[in-house]
Amino acid sequence: MKSTIIAALFAGTALATPVAQAGQPISTPSPTTLVSGAYWIRAVTSPNYHKYLQTKPANVPGTAVLESHTTAGQFNIESGQLVNKVSNPPLYLWVEEPADKANPPRTLATWFNTTKNSFGTFAWQGDTLTWSVPSVKRQNVAAWLVCKNQALFINTGAYSYQTPAGCVDQTIHYYNDKTANN
């Protein structure tokens, strides 16, 4: 009887904090104010205008996506590594290493992991985020693609030419105002 009453009291009640399954990383909210030494990274053209780099859920290992300013990650480049400055532990942006570097696929997947990326180097070109590696020739080191589910890919082809179906060409840039905006 007692357990029935307790179950009835909690039926339909939502938990205020996320609950992780055993062994799963716990998502932590991104600060809404930029931390010292970090930048927001966002697209500045449609259809992803002011969509920000992050993972879903926020600040855990997973696919790199461009999404809402309300859950934006905060980043900087350290020794060629793009690092999420607000995740604990830090997350590093990884790039898929193709089997045939001389003829790579048009898209190279990106994701965040707790270990340092072993393939390529990230750099700023002005405020633009670039990625390069000597073994993969690219026409534009600042060319990215946003594809299904807002996933971010390295574009190994020409920017805005023969864009793969379901993807859009994008460049992404740092933004250093105190708060991310829409």
What are these regions (language model features)?
Residues 10, 16, 27, 35, ...:
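Compositionally biased amphipathic helical and low-complexity segments enriched in hydrophobic
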Residues 87-120, 124-126:
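Signature of small four-pass
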Residues 49, 69, 78, 101, ...:
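Surface-exposed charge patches in extracellular/virion surface proteins
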Residues 1-24:
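Fungal secretory targeting signals
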Residues 21-61, 112-182:
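Extracellular glycan/ECM-engagement signal in secreted proteins
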Residues 7, 13, 32, 75, ...:
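Intrinsic-disorder/low-complexity peptide segments enriched for small residues
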Residues 56, 64-102:
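Short, well-structured hydrophobic secondary-structure segments
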